[in-house]
Regions:
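Short, polar/acidic, helix-capping and beta-turn segments at strand->helix junctions
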Residues: 2, 12, 19-169
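Short, positively charged
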Residues: 7, 11
Length: 169
C-alpha cells in the first residue's frame, strides 16, 4: 500500500495518497507502549472489493461482506507494519451501520421487503459471529454498536463497520 504517514507526538496517521478525506488507520501509542488502533469505516461491497482487488461485488450480501471488511483491515495493519494478523489485536469496539434493503419496494411489496430486511440482519449476525469463531476464537468479543440507516454512501453495501482495537505489547 502506498501510505502517506504522519506522526504527531504519540499519534500516527496512515492514509492512502489517493484519499484526501480521512485516514485509513489512526494509531495512538499509549503510555505502556500498547497501540490503540482506530480503523476506517469500511464496507464489504465496493470498498473492500476494490481494496482487495476482487472481481465480484458482494451486493447486499453480509455473508461475503463481513469477512471482506476484516480482510481489508488485516491487509492494512500488515502493510502498515503494525502486526501480521487481526488475531493479534484485542478489538474493543465495533461500530456497525446497517442499510435498508434496496428491494423489493416497501410500498408495493411490504411483506417481501420485511422478509428481505430480516434475511439481511440474520445473515449479518451469522457472518459476524462466524468470523470471530473461525478467525479469532481466542479473542474476547468487542462491544458492538449497531445503527440502521436508510442508506450508506456505498449503495451496494448492507453494512459499514468502524472499529477500535488494541495491540498489547
Amino acid at each position: 500500500m502506498d501510505w502517506e504517514i504522519k506522526k504527531r507526538g504519540r499519534v500516527t496517521y496512515y492514509r492512502k495518497k489517493s484519499n484526501e478525506l480521512f485516514s485509513d488507520l489512526v494509531v495512538e501509542e499509549l503510555d505502556n507502549g500498547d497501540l490503540k488502533i482506530r480503523f476506517v469505516g469500511m464496507t464489504g461491497a465496493l470498498a473492500a472489493t476494490n481494496e482487495l482487488s476482487l472481481n465480484e461485488v458482494a451486493r447486499m450480501d453480509p455473508e461475503r461482506e463481513i469477512p471482506r471488511i476484516f480482510d481489508t483491515w488485516e491487509m492494512y495493519v500488515r502493510e502498515a507494519g503494525i502486526c501480521e494478523s487481526l488475531a493479534e489485536l484485542d478489538f474493543l469496539e465495533i461500530h456497525s451501520f446497517g442499510a435498508a434493503p434496496k428491494g423489493p419496494s416497501p410500498i408495493t411489496e411490504p411483506e417481501k421487503y420485511a422478509a428481505e430486511k430480516k434475511r439481511i440482519r440474520q445473515d449479518y449476525s451469522q457472518a459476524y459471529a462466524n468470523y470471530w469463531k473461525e478467525k479469532m476464537p481466542d479473542n474476547g468479543l468487542p462491544v458492538r454498536f449497531t445503527v440502521y440507516l436508510e442508506e450508506l454512501p456505498d449503495v451496494d453495501a448492507s453494512y459499514e463497520f468502524g472499529a477500535v482495537a488494541l495491540l498489547q505489547k
